[in-house]
């Protein structure tokens, strides 16, 4: 059944939103996996766990807001299976942060692609919706992850045995 509120909302935008919702839920799932790992009793890096749990919640909230937007525009939400994270264990915090950065860049690219579709389909409402807060927050998260990776690498070079502990306590704490 066609929506009575749908106006200037192209099917390509609708499909792109559904794909982005799935990617956001997958990202949330990956971050939750990281948080769970760092909260384990044999890892015990609670601020890493908190940092990744916050990323997980943020991605989940974004997915839910995208769903709400889809409904506001008269689109139809088609939830898909959420892919399991590729791994459950992480060698160290640096590896997890590097994986998170790669993931966040892929999320940002998906948002940029969706923005391009909306612009191509002359949907200024959707381009505006994506620009703030999603694209700006995504860039901020990429910067934060990059800064954390740089700081942890510097610590690692001067305090290899204590780097994760010090970073967990003083940077993330």
From Swiss-Prot:
Sites where the protein binds Fe cation 1: 59, 62
Molecular function GO labels: ferric iron binding; ferrous iron binding
Residue sites binding Fe cation 2 per the record: 59
GO (cellular component) term, any one: cytoplasm
Entry keywords, A to Z: Iron, Iron storage, Metal-binding
One of the Pfam families matching this protein, by short name: Ferritin
UniProt keyword annotation of Iron present: yes
Entry keyword annotation includes Iron: yes
InterPro entries in the cross-refs: Ferritin (IPR001519), Ferritin-like (IPR012347), Ferritin-like_diiron (IPR009040), Ferritin-like_SF (IPR009078), Ferritin_CS (IPR014034), Ferritin_DPS_dom (IPR008331)
More info: There are three types of ferritin subunits in amphibia: L, M and H chains. M and H chains are fast mineralizing; the L chain is very slow mineralizing.
Subunit structure: Oligomer of 24 subunits. The functional molecule is roughly spherical and contains a central cavity into which the polymeric mineral iron core is deposited.
Protein name, UniProt field: Ferritin, lower subunit
Origin species: Aquarana catesbeiana (American bullfrog)
